[in-house]
Amino acid sequence: MSKRETTKYKIDRRMGENIWGRPKSPVNRRDYGPGQHGQRRKGKLSDYGVQLRAKQKLKGFYGDISEKQFRKTYEEAARRRGDTGENLIGLLESRLDAVIYRAKFVPTIFASRQFINHGHVNVNGRRTNIQSYRCKPGDVIEVREKSKQLVLVLESVQLAERDVPEYIEADHNQMKATFVRIPAFADVPYAVQMEPNLVVEFYSR
């Protein structure tokens, strides 16, 4: 098992949920956390514990991005007009690594981050290797010509376990996608319940 897969499944076990809806997730076989005594850890969480868990789950979904980067995203969401939780989701879904994953060019968010880092992606015709690049409505994201035959990409396009959301238009023949709009929370197809309102409460303490 690759380091990327180990990290992905470690997050699933830590959360006790299959947060990406993957068929091979270990939590499909058991309902307790990692470690020999993981099954003993269940109990009623405090309000702080519930908020912390909501933050860890949302942060984990996007590739377990650093706390510094996640908090910076939250602070930007809080400065914007409107609902902070909605803004937070919109900013996270606008990340280039999230768009590549949602477009089904790669099988996991972790693969997306590595794919971008290795220079396989163009945005509006220019190579971009910044995972956190903020996509804007109308941006065209495509797999570079030399990268289109990578097994990683071909396998992902064939996966039927998740659909491309309506805020992204994807052409899998051309390996090209357009970021149509910043989504509302209700538009985002999470495999498990996410609670951005609790994340806001966590940082508002």
From Swiss-Prot:
Domain spans labelled S4 RNA-binding: 94-157
Residue ranges, compositional bias (Basic and acidic residues): 1-16
One GO CC term on file: small ribosomal subunit
GO molecular function, one term: rRNA binding
UniProt GO BP: ribosomal small subunit biogenesis; translation
UniProt-listed Pfam families: Ribosomal_S4 (PF00163), S4 (PF01479)
CDD domains per the UniProt record, alphabetical: S4
Region (Disordered): 1-46
Entry keywords, A to Z: Ribonucleoprotein, Ribosomal protein, RNA-binding, rRNA-binding
Source superkingdom: Bacteria
Role: One of the primary rRNA binding proteins, it binds directly to 16S rRNA where it nucleates assembly of the body of the 30S subunit. With S5 and S12 plays an important role in translational accuracy.
Oligomeric and partner information: Part of the 30S ribosomal subunit. Contacts protein S5. The interaction surface between S4 and S5 is involved in control of translational fidelity.
NCBIfam families: PRK05327.1 (NF003717), rpsD_bact (TIGR01017)
Protein family according to the UniProt entry: Belongs to the universal ribosomal protein uS4 family.
Name of protein: Small ribosomal subunit protein uS4
Provenance organism: Bartonella quintana (strain Toulouse) (Rochalimaea quintana)
GN (gene name): rpsD
